Swiss-Prot record:
Transmembrane segments: none annotated. This is Phloretin 4'-O-glucosyltransferase. The gene is UGT75L17. It comes from the Eukaryota. It comes from Malus domestica. Belongs to the UDP-glycosyltransferase family.
């Protein structure tokens, strides 16, 4: 049997690298496929060297920002250069591989890279989108560009703190959405105007295909309605894309994503500290790899943690200044007024292995920005959540967490957009307390943990979906010969 050869192209950001690398491992382990992993040179340099599976090779290219995208860089210039250089690099790879007698079977690409699909079409190479956000978010974008734009814009252009009394319903989705539940790129005040045209380009490309398959980092039981909401698209759940050691245990050595674009804390004593705490007692606080909170918000979080009185592990990344600043790296925790009190009660680290932290029995709650990777990791680990969304898909994820999966409670900011210490403590007390809400979220967290692990078991939904996709690719490949 001829081996599948995949070209997997990923946007160079932490939230894209991690699930796509895990998908590469899944492809290799499921069928013995060969995967060539393509991303920028700056991202590749930060990918760990440990446990690279047989069948995975890297093909990094220069996007013109080999030291990474820095604050102060122009995002439109960056995206333009990434596209121009990426098209050339991937074209060269595809042509060279074909000339050597080892043509690629399929190109798989992540969000924000719709030009990859256009280029693959020109090269007569099948392509498929790896959607690394929930299926619900895909559906919302689809509806935005297919008849619901005015309705959505009308509901996101006014209101106090983006919370409106009115809500909208979208076909096939089980929840109604207010402004704060929708992806932030749709909001009039969204400053990241580069993103929405890329999603529009993506949807237009899919429209040209007949019943295209879209691989989604979710699983059937998690989003049954959203996966089936759009008849003309074949959305299939292939997730959760989480390291095997923390999911199905098939590969105990697979303990990290491998794509950690930030330096992990050199001092792993936080794991020993975690393990010394009583079961279910520790609050873990992390806002991911991109979000930067203002000093006022940081102070309120500190106040809420201190008032709660439970041990906590708080990830505060080193803040990188603009190029040319004398103080390029600043430790934000040093600016907190109550730093000494915080360190008496908890532990502050610049980065950590999140999947390891969440798997610790001492974890009682995860205060999270609700990035999709973090949301899935909390589900897989069975850890209840205080949802503290910031931007992009996170408001939608928080809505699903609180109202659909019911594994957490969402904070409500005040009129200035700040989540007060009192509000954070209120949510922590609900999630960690012995009342009905606390009992419900803990019970639901356990339920989804079991269902997530079941989904990737051999013969279950995500495993079957991936194998069906590979059979589909084989048919396409045979038709080309």
């Amino acid at each position: 049997m001829v081996q599948h050869r995949f070209l997997l192209v990923t946007f160079p950001a932490q939230g894209h690298i991690n699930p796509s690398l895990q998908f590469a491992k899944r492809l290799i382990n499921t069928t013995g496929a060969h995967v060539t992993y393509v991303t920028s040179l700056s991202a590749h340099r930060r990918i760990g060297n440990g446990s690279i599976p047989d069948g995975l090779t890297y093909a990094p290219f220069s996007d013109g920002y080999d030291d990474g995208f820095k604050p102060g860089d122009n995002v439109d210039d960056y995206m333009s250069e990434l596209r121009r250089r990426g098209v050339q690099a991937i074209t060269d790879l595809v042509v060279a591989s074909a000339n050597e007698g080892h043509p690629y079977t399929c190109l798989v690409y992540s969000l924000l890279l719709p030009w990859s699909a256009g280029m693959a079409h020109e090269l007569h190479l099948p392509s498929v989108l790896l959607w690394i956000q929930p299926a619900t978010v895909f559906d919302i974008y689809y509806y935005y560009f297919n008849g619901y734009k005015d309705l959505i814009r009308d509901n996101t252009s006014s209101g106090t703190n983006n919370v409106l009394p009115c809500s909208i319903e979208l076909p096939g989705l089980p929840l109604s959405f207010t402004s704060r539940d929708l992806p932030s790129f749709m909001v009039d005040t969204n400053p990241y105007n580069f993103a929405l045209p890329l999603f529009q380009e993506q949807m237009e490309l899919l429209e040209r295909e007949t019943n295209p398959t879209i691989l989604v980092n979710t699983f059937d039981a998690l989003e049954p309605e959203a996966l089936k909401a759009i008849d003309k698209y074949n959305l299939i759940g292939v997730g959760p894309l989480i390291p095997s050691a923390f999911l199905d245990g098939k590969d105990p050595s697979d303990k990290s994503f491998g794509g950690d674009l930030f330096q992990k804390s050199k001092d792993s004593s936080y794991l020993e500290w975690l393990n010394s705490k009583p079961e279910g007692s520790v609050i873990y606080v992390s806002f991911g790899s991109i979000s930067v909170l203002g000093k006022a918000q940081m102070e309120e979080i500190a106040k809420g943690l201190l008032d709660c009185g439970l041990p906590f592990l708080w990830v505060i990344r080193d803040k990188v200044g603009k190029k040319g600043d004398d103080n390029e790296a600043k430790k934000e925790e040093e600016m907190l007024r109550c730093r000494e009190e915080l360190e008496e009660l908890g532990m502050i680290v610049p980065w950590c292995s999140q999947v390891e932290v969440l798997s610790s029995p001492s974890l009682g709650c995860f205060v999270t920005h609700c990035g999709w990777n973090s949301s899935l990791e909390s589900l897989v680990s069975g850890v209840p959540v205080v949802a503290f969304p910031q931007w992009t898909d996170q408001g939608t994820n928080a809505k699903l967490i609180e109202d659909y999966w019911k594994t957490g409670v969402r904070v409500t900011p005040n009129e200035e957009g700040i989540v007060t210490g009192e509000e954070l403590k209120r949510c922590l007390d609900l999630v960690l307390g012995s009342g009905e809400i606390g009992e419900d979220v803990r019970r639901n967290a356990k339920k989804w943990k079991d269902l997530a692990r079941e989904a990737v078991s051999e013969g279950d939904s995500s495993d079957k979906n991936l194998r069906a996709f590979l059979d589909q690719i084989k048919v396409l490949k045979d038709a080309r010969h």
